[in-house]
Each structure stands twice: as C-alpha cells, then as structure tokens.
Amino acid sequence: ASDVYKRQVLGNYIRFLVDDCLKFVEREIRRGNKYDAIVMDPPSYGRGPSGEVWKLEKNLEELVSRCTLLLSDKPLFFLINAYTTGVSSTVLYNILKLTVGKTYGGAIDAGEIGLPISKNDLVLPCGIYGRWQDE
C-alpha cells in the first residue's frame, strides 16, 4: 500500500509505520507530536524481540487510549480495522466511545467486515471496523 501512496499526491502527507505500536506511540507522546487522523490495522497476535506478547483482546484498549493523546485539538477521524474473531464490533465501539469519544465527542460507528458468498447469499465474517469522526 505504501508504494501506491508514494506515487500519489498524498505521498508526502502519509506515514506508514512498521514498528512496535505501543513503543512508537509512547515515543510520539514524549516528542509532543500530534496527528489529525489515525488509521490502524493492529495484528491479532504478535511477539516482540524480547518475548513480549501482543494480543488484540488484551492490548487494544490501551493502544487506543494512548493514541487518543496523539490527536490534534481538532482531529478528523480515527479508524481501526482488525481481522480477528476475539473482539466484537460492540467492544470496539465501546473502546472508541470511552477513549476518543469521551475526549472529543463526535460520532462513532462500528461493524463487521465480511466477504459475500454469492452462490448462497451468505457473508463470511472476516473482522471488524470502528470509526470515530468529528461531527
């Protein structure tokens, strides 16, 4: 995805990060950096180089809460996409409401991501999304 954006007009305004997310967020907080929007696609599970364990079910609320401190005075949106069965869209909605929504108000939407199965009119669940946006 980053190669596509680098060729587009927005290439100079978007940063793609592959890093330990919580460590990155803490560094950005210390530096005083602010963001108008955050788009995240955190993994369901991961291990750090020193054996640290990341589990979306356990760590997502902390990550979103800390990221809220990175938002500018008038943020535009906060989007989370996750391919997991361990967190429901209702839980994601509640996390956004208790963090970003509590600080900035705005509108929150959350739901399931799915792939349509056309031959029997079903949807294969693939994950969840949650979006906070300024009203």
Residue ranges, per PLM feature:
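A short helix-to-beta-strand connector/capping loop
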Residues: 9-14, 104-106
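General small-molecule cofactor/ligand-binding pocket signal
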Residues: 15-17, 111
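Mobile active-site "lid"/loop adjacent to the S-adenosyl-L-methionine
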Residues: 11, 18, 35-66
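Helix-to-beta-strand junctions that scaffold the AdoMet/dcAdoMet cofactor pocket
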Residues: 71-73
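C-terminal catalytic and target-recognition region of SAM-dependent MTase-like enzymes
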Residues: 75-135
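Conserved SAM/SAH-binding loop
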Residues: 18-24
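A short acidic, Gly/Pro-enriched loop at the edge of an enzyme's catalytic core
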Residues: 26-37
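Short, small-residue-biased leader/transition segments that mark boundaries at the very start
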Residues: 1-5
